[in-house]
């Protein structure tokens, strides 16, 4: 455990995302986000500003600068790091589903979604991410992941170096995970925590999306033994919080 590692306060805010309406979604976040200084990290769902509007992916990707500007202001005003994904133009001519990690001073790290959901045709419009990204925040090493990446344990494997140091302490997952597969969502979050001996935060949307697909949320914060620390109410907007304990984590790694 690093000497500068203190408990980390995590908030996962599940939202009923307005379809292709960034202004409405920005207003929702403003109305429901934690008070300034009350947490260390705030997570928002995948494609938080537009919903998972894949048929209009290239169109909504052009709106990305406004979403990033909003996240930057939110982090600065809240005094916490903010994580969310946004559709952005990719150099290949396709679109990237990009996890933005933005700190209060404006420092920004990004990670593109690696695993595309071919059944829904994501591979036709989206470019795959190539890098496993870990950020360090207030002494914690945090791995960034987007939705379907959760299903791939090899991609998220937490390895130890020669000194027994793990790649990361916590896994952050932002998603638009359908209600029909809620059991897979909750099971996989716990599985990733247990197999990687790390904390896990999973944030999901609620409500019915533009395809008519319902989402129940089931956002949750998981301990390194797969134990449930906090769970959001199903089908309701709002955030759930928990504190991650570095001492507890260090004892598990012994």
Q: Which sequence ranges carry the predicted segments?
A:
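Short hydrophobic-aromatic micro-motifs
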Residues: 42-43, 141-146, 172-173, 201
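CN hydrolase (nitrilase-like) catalytic-core segments centered on the catalytic cysteine
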Residues: 66-83, 150-238
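Cys-nucleophile CN-hydrolase/nitrilase-fold catalytic domain and related Cys-dependent amidase chemistry
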Residues: 22-23, 30-104, 109, 178-192, ...
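Conserved small/polar residues in nucleotide/adenosyl-binding loops
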Residues: 253-254
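Short beta-strand scaffold segments in enzyme catalytic cores
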Residues: 84-86, 98-101, 133, 219-221, ...
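Short beta->alpha transition motifs characteristic of CBS
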Residues: 50, 100, 111-117, 220, ...
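Active-site catalytic loop in hydrolytic enzyme cores
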Residues: 90-166, 179-187
